[in-house]
Amino acid sequence: MDQEIERVVQAIAIASEPSQSTLFQEALNYIQGIQENANETWRLALQIFVATNGDQGRKYPPQARFWALRVLEEFLENKFDPLDPETFQTLQQAMMSYIQSEYVQGPAEANAPFIRNKFSHTLTLLFLCTYIDQWPSFFTDLFSLIQPSSQSSSTGLNRHISLLFFHLVLEISGEVADQMIKTARTWSAVRHARDGRVRDAVRERDAARINEAVLTIVATNVERMNALKEGDGDSQELGNSIELVDWGIRTFGSYVGWIDINLTVTPTTVPLLFKLLADSSLPIRLATSVALLRIVAKGLKEPADKLQLFKVLSLGQVLDALESKTAKQQRERGDDVDEGEESYREALGKLLNVYGLELTKLVEDAPTDDIRSDASAALVDLQPVTLRFLADDYDDTASTVFPLLQAVLGSYKRSRKVSSGPIDDQKRSFLSALLQVILKKMKWDEEAEPDDVDDDDNGEFEKMRKELRTFMDAILTIDQDLVTDEVRKLALQTISAYQSGTSLKWNDAELGVYLVYIFGEINKSGGKGRAAFCQTPAVIDKDKRKVTDYSEFPLTSHGEMLLALVQSGIVSYPNRTVSLQFFETVTRYADFFKVRKECILPALEAMIDKRGLHNENQQFRIRLYYLFYKFIRESRHEIPSQIALTIINSLPDLLSINVQLSEPEDPESDPLTEAVKSPVFESQLYLFETIGILTSTLSKDTEEQGNLLLSIVKPFMEELLANLQLFRAGSQDLVPVVKVHHIIMALGNISKGFPDHPASTTSENYMAPSFKVFAEIAQAILVCLEAMNVIKPIRDATRFAFARILATAGPTVTGYIPPLMNHLLAHFEPSELVDFMNFISLLIHKLQKDMFEVLDKLIAPLHSHITAILSQAASGTDELRWQIETKKAYLNLLVVILNARLEGIFTSERNSASFEALLGSLLRIVEDVSDPPSQKLALTFFGRCVTVWGQPAGSPNPELGGNLPGFERFIYEQIVPTAFGVVALPSFNPKDGQALMVIHEVASLLQTVCKTRGSEAYDYFLSAFLPSKGWPAEMALDFTTKLRDLDSKNFRKYFTELIRASRSS
């Protein structure tokens, strides 16, 4: 074996230095094979770990011995039954001999401390599989070693064995009782049962002695520690004592949750724990707080016992005193942050939180009034210190009591639902104090820099603010007036202080504005729209709202706050965070400016000058672009034409389009695709849309409007042409292409700011001058597209811009659609065809009859294009998915055409010859059970066809549709047989969810046929079609009757059951 061991040790050395040898992988595979074969190789590993030299030092290097422990762990990890006697004796004797030589007589792995922890875990695994039946004396054997020794005579206890004992108990507790560890590993019923048996055995045999040993070692070392502190003793000895106390309390805390509480909470342990909770050593204090937390959280069967435990502990008083003490120390430190001491306050907060939660459980679940009363009183006593923790400047500490506050407020809310009477004074006092703390905590730290978007602390503050809002909302549901009155008072005080010239910190100013911002959310009794800001009569007729002078009505509380906000000039506070919060607030409550129109101008002035859009900070401006857009959009009807002109004239410098190329983050990505994704430009687009909105408000003077629009877009079209010429000249620079893309998008957004073209206008000259400008824009964009249609971003931008221009200018520009289609489809990617058809569908929805001529030219080539695509075999899942999406978009387009009553394009002189082929291709889609969504759309199309062309000759209601000669034969000979046939196909699964949609659509189609053709259709089903399919006369009559008499919902249900029943039979 010695030679094999030497080979293994050598392989471990090679595998530990991957860069040093070409044999690394071979060595690694060799030792991994040994580890995976642990059932056969554990003896070898054991020898490597325990072997000694002649001087009793360890024979093999630490990394080899560490690996040996891993093999032993592999061997023991899943042993849930006793070991065979020989294996057990070998392991037991080797381990005890090792402990005797290394921990009792030796240095306890002083040169390789990492082995100590690994050995503790290995020995724990051996304990778990042998304690119950083979090694019941495990702890007795261990206790016998914690005896005086020459190297530890000063304390009377062996320090190394004491620490090993602590580590072992910690490991054992982790394995058999730590829920976090259990949750992290794969569930095993055998392991779970074994762990339960081990817990029971420890409780029965050794729990008392384990607890006694732990507390004896702790108490002895506490005494020693105090003596050394008082006598200015040896620092090494003091450190050793502190280490033992620290690990001893950690060990105590590890088992208090699963052994008898009468062992751990005694007249001796409680004073010891509270003494250590205030010890000068931070690790000891932290360990003690955890131990106390676990005692408090321990489940006891009887609520009375839990309450008695709390009375014995008197934890509320202790925590109150410690909070006061640590808060005083915190104040004395000032700006000198002590992370350790802050972690101690956090630990105290966690202890308080768990204690409070346990009290709330007693209040909620107590079986007697006495227990409930005592627990409730203790909980009330805890409230002041809870609020002090919440008020801590360190959010990690403040957030420790969040669960307790949620529980208390939840209890108050439940009580409020039961009783509508006034809140008792104690609760109201607590809620008022809590609200004060919340409002204070909602302030930014004075040293914070909210402008820094990369500062993680800013994100944490925003998160904290949201958490605090949930508490405020909870108080709101309990006592709304308390919250609204306090928020209103603080906001108005802050605004008034600024207006009067009182010195005001920026974070106080920001909070004041923020409270106005959230007031609309918390003021649940406020009205909607204008009624939220002024006290209007109960009802104002809809036709009188536009002429009503709302300035005559008194303001609501929120209206008064907004008026004070605007009039105070606090937007000018020399801090961008305050200004931004102002702009966020006035934008959110744009309806206020409809009742106090005199406030519009000062708000707009602030938005436009250096306080807003012209601020030097780019991130600030980016947000302002959107807020300005939103404010103008909501207030456009209140802005006089002259003001709109003034605003437009103040913005030209902000409309300049700058292209800055940077290196793509992903080297594999397309540089142009990355270049057009500019967050700055995407925000700037809001500004272009705002220009469009403002220009559209000049509709009373259409000539002036048209001239203004031309003056705005002309520079962009000139720049468009200049960059197009650079591209045509063969420039390899991306900048001209990006510029063209950006300008097209900008022009599209200017168009977007105009209202949609009305379905019918009262004047032929409706905005005619502006429409002429939009036609010029469309022409300029088409010229660019013709030259650059190989570039996808240009095609995407063009499609977007044309959607907006067509929606605005309507029939004036529909003539550009055919060349637009030709250029867009000359080069396209799969997704673009879907986008194009969705684009046409949108235009049909907006322009209706004005799209007839365009669609008449479009439908035949588009159908050919789609047919060609769908006829190709898909080469992979991506292509198959694209084909399905293309099919759905095309079917949806056909349905949209029929819904818009543009069916004439199918039967026009241009398209009538190909109409039958189109119908045939759609019938084949109905028959394709591999794509149920497309089946459903095709059936929907045929349902509309029946309504449109299937009306009987001389139909009394021409609005429903017309009569296409011969179409009734197509209904009976093609549509109905196909619809019936698809649900009868062997491959059609009526139980599938998507197939169910198809069944419902077939049912709807059949009812449409009957309702459209009347008695002729019923006779056809009863006398011809159903008998031809072999239906008995009685069954055919029942079906036809239900088809005629049931409403659509009930017939769908009947038809579904019929299809499913036919399959099962």
Swiss-Prot record:
Name of the protein this chain belongs to: Exportin-T
SUPFAM superfamilies from the UniProt entry: ARM repeat
Matches recorded under InterPro entries: ARM-like (IPR011989), ARM-type_fold (IPR016024), Exportin-1/Importin-b-like (IPR013598), Exportin-T_C (IPR045546), XPOT (IPR040017)
MF annotations from Gene Ontology: small GTPase binding; tRNA binding
Chief subcellular location: nucleus
Organism: Coprinopsis cinerea (strain Okayama-7 / 130 / ATCC MYA-4618 / FGSC 9003)
Family the UniProt entry places it in: Belongs to the exportin family.
Keywords (A to Z) from UniProt: Cytoplasm, Nucleus, RNA-binding, Transport, tRNA processing, tRNA-binding
Function comment: tRNA nucleus export receptor which facilitates tRNA translocation across the nuclear pore complex. Involved in pre-tRNA splicing, probably by affecting the interaction of pre-tRNA with splicing endonuclease.
PANTHER family, per database record: EXPORTIN-T (PTHR15952:SF11), EXPORTIN-T/LOS1 (PTHR15952)
Intracellular or extracellular location(s): Nucleus; Cytoplasm
GO biological process: tRNA processing; tRNA re-export from nucleus
GO cellular component assignments: cytoplasm; nuclear matrix; nuclear pore
Gene3D superfamilies named in the record: Leucine-rich Repeat Variant
